[in-house]
């Protein structure tokens, strides 16, 4: 088996570590170095390429462990189509993951690796800091798949794969104990264990420390305990909060090791469930700094006997904490059963009630009762309690049902003393066939977006952050409830997309506003946007719940989850501690929460909340309107609600709008048109197909306009994903100018009329049907974006503006819903409003009503029909405003252009929901353009509110032309429109000339015909199948603004061509509205080219034929009103264009002065019905034709009176609007000429340049000298130049040699350019351009024709093609897809590119890639056989040399003797032999003088006694070469040769049926197989013999071949030989050094003995000399 394992072993790719079979780890995980992005990309590219090459048919999956944020790994691997699964690298600071996540990882890994029929691979990767959790997960995977046994052994093995310092560097505490605990959890689990597991809830009572650790330096500590984990009272498994500490810091007691022999008990009292992290911290004497003593992570599922015993071995401590803990340290974590009736946290709090700073004990326990015992609250309520049971239940509601206490009856206690049982208050959840598991619950609860909106207008950001940081948060079924010390409740939503953008934009507004006044005003602005940002969804099951009050806060939030949007509305009072109504939607249930405690009683008007379903099916849907009215009593008494629950009617509607009003200091006395009171309990809204209309108007009774006295909606700042706001807020943004300049006048929420006894009937038609035209209560006008919104009426001038380019579709939709202002209305005015007769809904609205929500284009402009009072029912229309004087003005370039689309709208759009199209109604709204400021457009009210003017800044930008209507959000719809005959979208208009931009202006529309009945009605110009403009409704009303006389005209520098948009034609009768669109909608015309003169030129009027396109709108959008639509539409005839303008006319007739000497140019003649006859207007007349213009820019005359014929414009009339002139090289329109006058075209210059003679010779690209300096060479040449100096050159020959080659096809340069642009390319490319280029580059290296190359390849001629060229050919063989592409090509194959020709040549040979590979194998076969045989012979020779060496045997015997001598009397003594790696330990055993080792001693002994053994290593000739070889690599090479020959034989058999094309190939290949077969067989036999010799060598030295393979044997012996030779050489050097030293000493002594010393008297002194003399 060991041989087979080595035989089939495949070396893993470089930079990967194989942990288990098909489980690899990137080696970058074991390093702390950080690679640059480019280097990291190359690192991954190389690994993936190697994996693709080695495992061609395998699939890869990457598990990445990382922190939060964007991961580079996912993006890189996605380029290769490799799946990446991201996991966090810590859980609450502990390098572990929750048990359920660990099980998910293990199950997924096992299924991936065990997938039948596939060989999948797992790649493990961790980003910086993720190695600890990756090591744990790897160990868990090995244990889970039964590849290893023993948790600690497996974990230590994985730890050792990385440097030891890496784990200490990444973690402050040693995570091994917690890792082992969770590995034991994994091993305890078997197949019968329920997964996912259901953790058992416990109450963590206390932590007992049996030994006191030393953390204060004097043998003691001051401990506290913190517990982190899932909040037990919520169902959100991701809501990980810090549970309350055992004691406050200031009450933590200090314990000593010796003085306190008793155990330390730290009370906790927290509810825990699932994965829990317990930390024990030491507080220093200053009570400020803390230090973590130990940490424990565990799961409550495995708690046994209500105790978790701990000791020093199974707690996470710091790496140097051994000195602080004794080895006898023990601790215990005690638990108790969780009791739902009494929360343990109450008991713990009561233990320290003297330490908690609260007002009183009663207040404390009352608050605890509210927050923790929701199932046992009972008492009185001030609001009506509604309970609706549905037969359907969503998975989220099913999940809610499994939550704690969800099946209990809800009882509310109010007042503490008096408690009344509410019989009907039961949270009912009907169970459906659909079951929601906890795993699905995780999916439901993913993507939680916590959008927090705060409370007070004067609250600073720091205060908000401080308040939010101290929150104790929990989440109940998608609705996060954060409870903080200030007794405020912040309700946030989950899974809301467009709401995020709204909050972000508002956050940016606040960040750019400096003063509190601006912040106050901004928060008023965003009331309607917050309340209309999300549609209210279908509610299947509605329950009620009453809870605590939240003072001084006002939040409106919306939630959406799992295709069922959940609405979370909290309406609260801003001033004082007033009664608060809360309506919370939990999944499919509604809980209405009134205030329990009030320090002082105040009366308010009840809030009314409207809820409408967003349905997705054709069956009946439920919409409900809740009328929540608190009984107002100034004495503070409560209204007992023991009466049965009030019913609410279910409505089959698609769009509603709910108008809310809050007024303080007064009792609500809201009446309908008949004076009936509004404190009624039920409401019935009539279904109206696709719209809601009302005969009443929302009013505001005694509404204060002071922002400080009004109810405010505040926004709490919270960080979100980044959004580009450069286009939203420029330094001179109109948003900021508007916010800083506009007053804070605000119309507040008006009460809802709630009494109706008529039952609603579903309506399937597209008309606005009413059950009663004059019912007692008026229905409420409702607007909608997609579906109904909870909306408030806000001062429209305070609404923030957005540029189209910076907003997404969802967020742009939310900006279009603008309610009409009604700040001056009173309730008495309601009697003047009657129901407007129903209007027909065009068929396009009916069709759009059935489209999906995401197909509706949001950019809709609607002018709402007025619902006039009886007094003004037949009031004639107001005269049109006079045009402004002709004054030129310029605009600042740095300002941001505001879409005229937004400037002109009075109400938000009315796009269809899933089943209806809403038509918006507003009351007394009219439009007026003249303003007191030149940059504003006024939108005024009707007669009832004529004193109110809304100003919208109209500032434009010059640098970038924009489309009139944003088109980015409707690409899919536009494609659909084109297929169904809809409109195409025009290209963007060309830019203006610099000198023409400053003269463009906006014309004013003309007055409509008489008899409009005072109703302002326009169509909703949506770009969905409807064309540029829809047939207008009957009437248009204009009102002059008396307070702001015009001062100067408004000029838009960005307007196309400087031409004013033509005025709107008179609309046809209403009965023709829906008929006029049946003939198809004409397409939008292309944009006008830029003008060339100094003054703009008016565009031509629409042609008389039906379906004539209107002129394009200006780039900035629609100025006030949409462009005029074509009136006809039934016919498809096209009229001839308007006659051109004669020469000399350079401008448009200027508008008449203010005095009224004429109006603006009248609209063009409308198209007729199938015959060109103009349709009659409301009075039966015809539309007025354009006035006869005056010559040379004169003032236009008055329009033709109604009834007059509409003669066409005769050609050549001065002053007529010409067609769009050509500009800067563009040809003029047909039949027209270029505009002559102030702005001349450059055509003359271009023509003169074109007529200039061009040289026919090739140019010499030199640097020209135009001025010869005095004294220079060129100056002298100029003086001496004469006519004969150039005669020596033959000019004709020069011209013939250097002439420009004539073009093969005639035509001028422009003709050639246009022809080359319009004609097809010479070569047709079917293959990817990059691959084609690489193929052509490769073919340049093969310098032979393609047929010759193929012949050489089929002949297996290695003299023509080498191995490198074949590798390139194999790499660029066509794939199956490319072959199919070329086979399906039916065109001329001669026109194909070189790459395609090459592929076609290869496709002529069957299985060409296989043949190339056979050819490459044949070329490399002999060299491969030779190399493998040589290496195998080297291994075999080395084995024979080692086994046959007698000298080595004697040396091993002597080493055995020395070892037994040293180990005599120890367990290691009396050994019969020793392991081979013990040879290397001879150098580790040193003598006393530290210069001699046992190896030196061995060499010395052998040199003295057996010198013939010292050269034993000379017998090992092949040892060094063999040590560099690996049998595994040789096995792969040998197997490659064998498999290669098998493929050769397979191809030989397959080529039998190829026919003549493979005849030569088959013959040559047959000869090759006959000769190579014997070589392969002999090689296999040699490999088998070598394998046996290698195993025999291991057995010879007493080793197991499986544990000590051949490579290890040879490397060990080679190292021993090196150490032996080194020691022997050192011994020789030492002996020589000793000899030299002894010789010197002997010579020195001899010299001293031979030298006599004479004394002073001449006698010889025999005594030795003193060294000091």
From Swiss-Prot:
Entry superkingdom: Eukaryota
Domain C2 tensin-type, first and last residues per copy: 199-338
InterPro entries the record matches: C2_domain_sf, FH2_Formin, FH2_Formin_sf, Formin_homology_domain, Prot-tyrosine_phosphatase-like, Tensin_C2-dom
Pro residues bias (residue ranges): 1060-1069, 1098-1127, 1136-1190, 1198-1230
Residues forming coiled coils: none
Residue stretches making up the Phosphatase tensin-type domain: 5-193
Gene3D superfamilies, alphabetized: 2.60.40.1110, Formin, FH2 domain (1.20.58.2220), Protein tyrosine phosphatase superfamily (3.90.190.10)
Basic and acidic residues bias locations: 1036-1050
Record keywords: Hydrolase, Protein phosphatase
Molecular function in Gene Ontology: phosphoprotein phosphatase activity
Residues annotated as catalytic: 126
Region (Disordered): 688-709, 1025-1240, 1631-1669
Location of the FH2 domain: 1247-1646
Stated family: Belongs to the formin-like family. Class-II subfamily.
Name the record gives this protein: Formin-like protein 12
């Amino acid at each position: 088996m060991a041989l087979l394992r080595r035989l089939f072993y495949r070396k893993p790719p470089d930079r990967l570590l194989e942990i288990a079979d098909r489980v690899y780890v990137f080696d970058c995980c074991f390093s702390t170095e950080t690679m640059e992005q480019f280097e990291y990309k190359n690192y991954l590219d190389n690994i993936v390429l190697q994996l693709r090459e080695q495992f061609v048919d395998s699939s890869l999956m990457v598990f990445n462990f990382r922190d939060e944020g964007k991961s580079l790994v996912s993006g890189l691997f996605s380029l290769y189509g490799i799946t990446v699964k991201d996991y966090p690298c810590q859980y609450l600071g502990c390098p572990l993951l929750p048990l359920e996540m660990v099980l998910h990882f293990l199950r997924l890994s096992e299924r991936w690796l065990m997938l039948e029929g596939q060989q999948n691979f797992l790649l493990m990767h961790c980003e910086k800091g993720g190695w600890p959790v990756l090591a744990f997960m790897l160990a868990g995977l090995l244990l889970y798949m039964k590849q290893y046994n023993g948790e600690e052994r497996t974990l230590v093995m994985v730890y050792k794969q990385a440097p030891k310092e890496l784990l200490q560097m990444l973690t402050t505490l040693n995570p091994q104990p917690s890792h082992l605990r969770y590995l034991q959890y994994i091993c305890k689990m078997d197949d019968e264990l329920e997964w996912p597991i259901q953790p058992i809830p416990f109450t963590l009572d206390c932590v007992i420390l049996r030994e006191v650790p030393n953390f204060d330096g004097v043998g003691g500590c001051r401990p506290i305990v913190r517990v982190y984990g899932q909040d037990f009272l919520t169902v959100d498994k991701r809501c990980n909060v810090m549970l309350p500490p055992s004691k406050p810091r200031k009450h933590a007691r200090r314990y000593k090791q010796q003085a306190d022999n008793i155990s330390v008990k730290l009370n906790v009292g927290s509810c825990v469930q699932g994965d829990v992290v317990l930390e024990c911290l030491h507080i220093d004497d200053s009570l400020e700094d803390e230090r973590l003593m130990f940490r424990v992570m565990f799961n409550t599922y495995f708690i046994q006997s209500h105790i978790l015993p701990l000791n020093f071995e199974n707690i996470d401590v710091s790496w140097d904490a051994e000195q602080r803990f004794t080895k006898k340290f023990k601790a215990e974590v005690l638990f108790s059963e969780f009791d739902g009736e009494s929360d343990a946290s109450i008991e713990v709090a009561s233990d320290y009630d003297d330490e908690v700073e609260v007002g009183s004990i009663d207040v404390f326990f009352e608050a605890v009762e509210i927050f923790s015992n929701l199932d046992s609250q009972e008492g009185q309520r001030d609001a009506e309690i509604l309970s609706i049971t549905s037969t359907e239940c969503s998975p989220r509601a099913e999940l809610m049902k499994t939550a704690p206490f969800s099946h209990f009856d809800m009882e509310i206690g109010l007042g503490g003393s008096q408690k009344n049982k509410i019989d009907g208050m039961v949270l009912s959840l009907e169970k459906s066939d659909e079951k929601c598991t906890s795993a699905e619950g995780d999916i439901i609860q993913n993507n939680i977006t916590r959008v927090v909106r705060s409370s007070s207008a004067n609250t600073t950001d720091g205060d908000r952050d401080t308040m939010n940081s101290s929150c104790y948060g929990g989440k109940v079924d998608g609705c996060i409830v954060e409870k903080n010390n200030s007794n405020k409740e912040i309700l946030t939503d989950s899974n809301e997309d467009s709401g995020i953008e709204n909050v972000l934009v508002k956050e940016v507004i606040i960040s750019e506003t400096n003063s509190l006044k601006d912040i106050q005003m901004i928060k008023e602005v965003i009331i309607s946007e917050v309340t209309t940002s999300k549609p209210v969804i279908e509610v299947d099951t509605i329950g009620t719940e009453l809870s605590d009050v939240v003072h001084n806060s006002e939040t409106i939030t919306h939630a959406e989850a799992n295709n069922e949007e959940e609405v979370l509305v909290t309406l609260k009072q801003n001033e004082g501690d007033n009664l608060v109504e809360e309506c919370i939607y939990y999944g499919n249930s509604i809980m209405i929460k009134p205030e329990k405690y009030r320090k002082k009683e105040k009366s308010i008007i009840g809030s009314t909340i409207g809820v409408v379903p967003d349905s997705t099916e054709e069956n009946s849907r439920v919409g409900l309107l809740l009328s929540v009215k608190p009984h107002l009593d100034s004495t503070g008494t409560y209204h007992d609600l023991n009466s049965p629950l009030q019913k609410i009617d279910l409505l089959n509607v698609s769009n509603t709008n709910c108008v809310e009003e809050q007024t303080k200091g007064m009792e609500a006395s809201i009446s309908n048109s008949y004076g009936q009171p509004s404190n009624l309990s039920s409401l019935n809204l009539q279904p109206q197909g696709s719209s809601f209309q009302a005969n009443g108007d929302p009013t505001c009774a005694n509404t204060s306009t002071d922002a400080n006295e009004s109810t405010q909606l505040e926004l709490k700042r919270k960080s979100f994903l980044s959004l580009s706001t450069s286009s939203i807020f420029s330094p001179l943004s109109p948003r900021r100018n508007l916010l800083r300049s506009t007053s804070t006048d605000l119309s507040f929420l008006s009460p809802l009329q709630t009494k109706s006894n008529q039952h609603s009937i579903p309506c399937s038609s597209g008309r606005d049907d009413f059950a009663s035209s004059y019912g007692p209560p008026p229905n409420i006008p409702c607007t909608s974006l997609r579906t109904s919104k909870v909306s408030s009426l806000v001062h429209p001038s305070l609404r923030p503006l957005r540029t189209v380019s910076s907003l997404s579709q969802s967020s742009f939709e939310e900006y279009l819903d603008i309610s009409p202002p009604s700040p001056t209305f009173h309730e008495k005015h309601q009697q003047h409003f009657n129901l407007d007769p129903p209007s027909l809904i065009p068929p396009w609205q009916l069709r759009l009503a059935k489209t999906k929500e995401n197909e509706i284009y949001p950019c809709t402009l609607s002018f709402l029909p007025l619902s006039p009072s009886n007094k003004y029912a037949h009031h004639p229309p107001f005269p049109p405003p006079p045009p402004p004087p002709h004054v030129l003005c310029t605009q600042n370039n740095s300002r941001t252009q505001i879409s005229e689309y937004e400037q002109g709208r009075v109400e938000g759009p009315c796009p269809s929901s899933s089943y209806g199209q809403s038509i918006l109604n507003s009351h007394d709204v009219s439009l007026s353009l003249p303003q007191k400021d030149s940059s504003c457009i006024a939108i005024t009210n009707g007669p009832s509110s004529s004193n109110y003017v809304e100003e919208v800044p109209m500032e434009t930008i010059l640098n970038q032309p924009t489309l009139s209507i944003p088109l980015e959000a409707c690409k899919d719809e536009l494609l659909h429109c084109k297929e169904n005959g809809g409109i195409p979208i025009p290209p963007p208009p060309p830019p203006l000339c610099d000198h023409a931009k400053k003269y463009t202006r906006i014309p004013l529309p003309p007055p409509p015909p008489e008899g409009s009945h005072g109703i302002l009605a326009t169509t909703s110009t949506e770009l969905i199948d409807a064309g540029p403009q829809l047939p207008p409704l009957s009437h248009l009303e204009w009102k002059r603004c008396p307070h702001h006389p015009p001062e100067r005209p408004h000029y838009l520098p960005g307007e196309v061509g400087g031409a004013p948009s033509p005025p709107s034609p008179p609309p046809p009768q209403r009965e023709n509205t829906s008929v006029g669109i049946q003939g198809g909608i004409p397409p939008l015309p292309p944009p006008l080219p830029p003008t060339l003169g100094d003054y703009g030129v008016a565009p031509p009027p629409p042609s008389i034929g039906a379906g004539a396109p209107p002129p394009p709108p200006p780039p900035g959008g629609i100025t006030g009103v949409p462009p005029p639509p074509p009136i006809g539409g039934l016919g498809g005839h096209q009229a001839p264009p308007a006659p051109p303008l004669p020469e000399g006319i350079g401008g448009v007739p200027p508008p008449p002065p203010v005095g009224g000497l004429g109006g603006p140019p009248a609209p063009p003649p409308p198209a007729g019905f199938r015959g060109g006859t103009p349709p009659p207007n409301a009075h039966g007349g015809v539309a007025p034709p354009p006035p006869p213009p005056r010559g040379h820019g004169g003032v236009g005359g008055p329009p033709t009176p109604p009834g007059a014929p509409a003669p066409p414009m005769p050609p050549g009339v001065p002053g007529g609007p010409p067609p769009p002139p050509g500009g800067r090289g563009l040809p003029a329109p047909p039949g027209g000429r270029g505009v002559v006058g102030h702005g001349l075209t450059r055509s003359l210059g271009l023509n003169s340049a074109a007529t200039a003679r061009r040289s026919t010779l090739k140019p010499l690209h030199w640097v020209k000298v135009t001025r010869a300096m005095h004294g220079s060479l060129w100056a002298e040449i100029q003086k001496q130049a004469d006519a004969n100096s150039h005669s020596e050159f033959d000019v004709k020959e020069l011209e013939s040699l250097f002439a420009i080659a004539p073009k093969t096809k005639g035509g001028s340069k422009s003709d050639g350019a246009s022809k080359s642009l319009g004609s097809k390319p010479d070569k047709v490319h079917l293959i990817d351009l990059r691959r084609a280029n690489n193929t052509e580059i490769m073919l340049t290296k093969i310098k032979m024709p393609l047929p010759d190359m193929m012949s050489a390849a089929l002949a297996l001629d290695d003299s023509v093609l080498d191995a490198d060229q074949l590798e390139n050919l194999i790499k660029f063989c066509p794939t199956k897809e490319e072959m199919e592409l070329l086979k399906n090509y039916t065109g001329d194959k001669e026109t194909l590119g070189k790459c395609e020709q090459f592929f076609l040549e290869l496709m002529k040979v069957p299985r060409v890639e296989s043949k190339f590979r056979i050819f490459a194998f044949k070329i490399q076969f002999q060299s491969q056989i030779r190399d493998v045989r040589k290496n195998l012979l080297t291994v075999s020779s080395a084995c024979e040399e080692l086994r046959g060496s007698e000298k080595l045997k004697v040396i091993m015997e002597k080493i055995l003797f020395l070892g037994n001598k040293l180990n005599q009397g120890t367990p290691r003594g009396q050994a019969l032999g020793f392991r081979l790696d013990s040879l290397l330990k001879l150098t580790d055993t040193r003598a006393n003088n530290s210069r001699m080792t046992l190896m030196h001693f061995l060499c010395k002994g052998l040199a003295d006694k057996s010198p013939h053994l010292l050269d034993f290593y000379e017998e090992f000739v092949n040892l060094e070469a063999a040590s560099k070889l690996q049998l595994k690599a040789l096995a792969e090479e040998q197997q490659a040769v064998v498999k290669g020959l098998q493929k050769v034989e397979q191809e030989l058999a397959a080529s039998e049926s190829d026919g003549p094309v493979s005849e030569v190939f088959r013959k040559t290949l047959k000869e090759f197989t006959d000769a190579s077969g014997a070589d392969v067989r002999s090689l296999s036999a040699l490999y088998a013999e070598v394998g046996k010799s290698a195993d025999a060598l291991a057995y010879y030295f007493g080793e197991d071949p499986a544990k000590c393979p051949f490579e290890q044997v040879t490397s060990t012996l080679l190292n021993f030989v090196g150490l032996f030779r080194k020691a022997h050489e050192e011994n020789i050097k030492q002996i020589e050094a000793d000899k030299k030293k002894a010789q010197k000493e002997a010579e020195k002594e001899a010299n001293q003995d031979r030298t006599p010393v004479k004394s002073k008297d001449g006698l010889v002194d025999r005594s030795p000399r003193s060294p000091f003399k």
